[in-house]
Each structure stands twice: as C-alpha cells, then as structure tokens.
Design a protein with these regions (language model features):
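A conserved helix-loop-beta module that forms one wall/lid of the active-site cleft
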Residues: 1-27
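A short linear hydrophobic-aromatic micro-motif
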Residues: 14-17, 52-55, 121-124
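Protein kinase-like catalytic core scaffold
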Residues: 15, 76, 122, 138-141
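Anionic group-transfer/hydrolysis microenvironments
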Residues: 20, 58-59, 68, 125-127, ...
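Phosphate-binding site of ATP-dependent enzymes
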Residues: 24-111
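Glycine-rich phosphate/pyrophosphate-binding beta-alpha loops
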Residues: 25, 143-155
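A short beta-strand motif that forms the metal-chelation/ATP-contact edge
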Residues: 67-70, 134-148
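A long amphipathic alpha-helix within ATP-dependent nucleotide-binding catalytic cores
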Residues: 88-135, 166-175, 180
Length: 185
C-alpha cells in the first residue's frame, strides 16, 4: 500500500515517511528509493503491525514555520531553519528558531487548519510560498501537542503559562461530565 501511495504522490524520490506516533523529529525518515520504502515499511510493521505512517512529498527548503493557534486565533509564529547535515527543522534536533511575523493570508489559512481539526491549541507547520502576501502556504502538518521550547527561545514568552491562564476560566472545563459507563443507571 505504501508503494501505491507513493505513486499517488507522483512517484518521485526522495519522499518523507512519518510515523503517526512520532514527535520531536523522531519517526521522520527520508526515503530515497522504492526499495528503501519497502524495507522501511517492513521494519516498522515488524515493530508494530498497527503502526500508521504518512508519506509526504520531499520539499527542499531552508526553513519551515510553526504557527501557534490558541482558541482558534493566531498567537504567534517561529521560523525554524533546517538543521545542518539533516533535512528536519525540529528545535529538539538543534534548529535555532527565531520569531517571524505571518502575513494575513498565512494567518487565515493557519486558523482555518486549526478549526478543521477542532484544536484548542495546535501548532500548524507550513512552508511559506514565494509570494507570501498573495499565495497560500504549503501545509506540512498540524500538531495537536506542539512543543513550547522553540517558541520560548525565539520570543522569550512562556507560551504554556499564557495558554493555561487563557483557558483557566473557560466554560469548556466547567461542563458536567456527560459520559456514562455501562454500570451507571
């Protein structure tokens, strides 16, 4: 099935394979050929027959952007340069983040992406277009548990603390539990 999915991406290598349970850049693999894809999927299946994977087109860039969307609204973003001698831009792997301002178009698309997954707080990872004012970004992924270390390094803001303060008195936390077990009458 991975080979079929690869062909739907256009059949051009290299591609990126991601495990659905990875984080911090772990589980992100650059695959250079069909035989490498086959071997990688076999290994992952051997480790966990239920492991889900995602295939993505490889895009060569100097950096990506992580936009933090909190409560459906854009909060801020960081630019993450690709790590030297690697293809990933995770802060946990050594990327040196810096604060970046998004265009109105980028903010609109990132907020729409967060709304699509119903995320209270998500990290939307994008590749900016060449004409950032007029052309939408390319989406990499939406992280339901984004890290805050890079954001704090780049901005000095304690994002996690500010999010907790923002959500402290929200109605969502005050709703009664409506779930019942089979033993409840």
């Amino acid at each position: 099935k991975a080979i079929e999915a690869m062909e739907r991406l256009g059949g051009k290598y290299p591609i990126i394979l991601k495990t659905l349970t990875g984080s911090l850049g772990v589980g992100v693999i650059k695959v250079d050929s069909e035989s490498s894809l086959h071997s990688t999927v076999q290994l992952l299946y051997k480790l966990d027959p239920n492991m889900g994977v995602l295939l993505q087109q490889m895009v060569s860039v100097d950096y990506d952007i992580r936009a933090h969307i909190v409560g459906g609204k854009y909060h801020g973003a960081i630019q993450r340069p690709v790590v030297k001698k690697d293809f990933r831009s995770n802060v946990s792997l050594g990327s040196k983040p810096s604060k970046i301002e998004l265009t109105d178009l980028e903010i609109e698309h990132c907020e729409r992406a967060a709304k699509a997954v119903d995320g209270l707080w998500v990290g939307v990872d994008i590749f900016p277009s060449k004409n950032r004012e007029k052309t939408p970004p390319m989406f990499i992924e939406i992280n339901s548990t984004p890290g805050t270390k890079g954001y704090r390094k780049a901005t000095g803001e304690n994002l996690a603390k500010n999010i907790l303060i923002k959500f402290k008195n929200r109605e969502i936390w005050l709703k009664p539990n409506t779930y019942k077990s089979m033993f409840d009458s």
